[in-house]
């Protein structure tokens, strides 16, 4: 997960089995290599506290599995970046985000709150380009290159069936963490929330944009 607060950093969740000795040795070996290559200049190891109040307690194993699979999905998206134009990359991210959240959409009353939360920054011309791109090109086939996309969607269906917190809260938290993995930039996240809402409103108003 990428963050900018304090200073730019990456947070890695590490799961240890048994006494975890071998796994810890691998972690420290990785850290030493990263320090030597100057990929990082510092590190800290902290206890991981599950956020039950945010995601609910009953399905947390599924939530953590989603974290792992969504991380793979974000890496796959970022690998495609160099072969896409800016509009194609933004359109792909909007398509994937809506696809992931489809199971929630019929259950959330206030979509405007979820997707336009805390932001008034909408570039209408960019939003129109994204809508046109999604309407005229087959992003379903492009998403077949993203091996973790379907697995994420299937996991979300199970998570929803076992949820213990409101739909809006769960959708908002999962969307936020998805964009943290992609960008780690709140301003950029809020711009994407606007794009998502623009596409959803367009489909409500009869513009055909297929999201699968």
Each predicted region: which residue ranges?
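An acidic, charge-biased composition feature
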Residues: 1-212
């Amino acid at each position: 997960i990428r963050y900018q607060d304090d200073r730019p950093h990456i947070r890695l969740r590490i799961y240890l089995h048994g006494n975890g000795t071998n796994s810890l040795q691998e972690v420290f070996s990785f850290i030493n290599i990263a320090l030597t290559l100057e990929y990082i200049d510092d590190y800290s190891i902290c206890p991981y506290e599950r956020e039950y109040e945010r995601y609910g307690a009953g399905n947390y194993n599924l939530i953590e599995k989603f974290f792992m699979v969504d991380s793979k999905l974000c890496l796959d998206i970022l690998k495609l970046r160099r072969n896409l134009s800016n509009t194609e990359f933004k359109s792909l991210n909007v398509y994937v985000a809506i696809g992931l959240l489809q199971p929630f959409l019929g259950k959330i009353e206030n979509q405007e709150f979820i997707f336009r939360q805390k932001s008034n920054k909408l570039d209408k011309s960019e939003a129109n380009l994204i809508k046109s791109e999604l309407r005229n090109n087959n992003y379903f086939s492009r998403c077949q290159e993203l091996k973790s996309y379907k697995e994420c969607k299937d996991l979300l269906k199970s998570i929803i069936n076992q949820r213990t917190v409101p739909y809006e809260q769960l959708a908002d938290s999962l969307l936020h963490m998805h964009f943290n993995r992609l960008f780690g930039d709140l301003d950029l996240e809020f711009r994407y929330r606007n794009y998502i809402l623009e596409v959803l409103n367009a489909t409500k108003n009869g513009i055909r944009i297929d999201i699968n």
